[in-house]
Amino acid sequence: MNVLVTGANGFIGKNLIVHLNELGMHTIAYTRENSTQELPDLIKKSDFIVHLAGENRPKDEKDFNTVNAGLTTSICKSVRALGKKIPILLASSIQATFDNAYGKSKLDAELIVKRFESDTGNPVYICRLPG
């Protein structure tokens, strides 16, 4: 199985990649160094997507939405364009219920994948992590 991991250089991403590789899975890393233009080719090679990438300390609060909701939108659009169902696990935050820019951006990302699942039948899983 080929697993695309966004946020692959983060704490969870690095450890998840090690674990998945130990289980014999092939991992595809997507980091801040990648561009969204690379996503379609990476997704084309994927059987499962673990979307961990997110912004939590931007210089400008607008970057919360650009990264947290924008990248999620790009992933969903790329999967839709392929015409095949690729399960997506979205790492969200318990702060998705908070009234702040970070929480709103995480909630927006959740709503994007839920709408994507509703529109396409593509499996989506959301994990609200603490912190």
Residue ranges and their predicted role:
Residues 4, 28, 125:
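Conserved beta-strand positions in the Rossmann-like core of class I SAM-dependent methyltransferases
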Residues 35-74, 78-80, 94-98:
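NAD(P)H-binding glycine-rich loop region in Rossmannoid oxidoreductase-like domains
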Residues 6, 49-53, 88-93, 127-129:
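SDR active-site strand-loop-helix element
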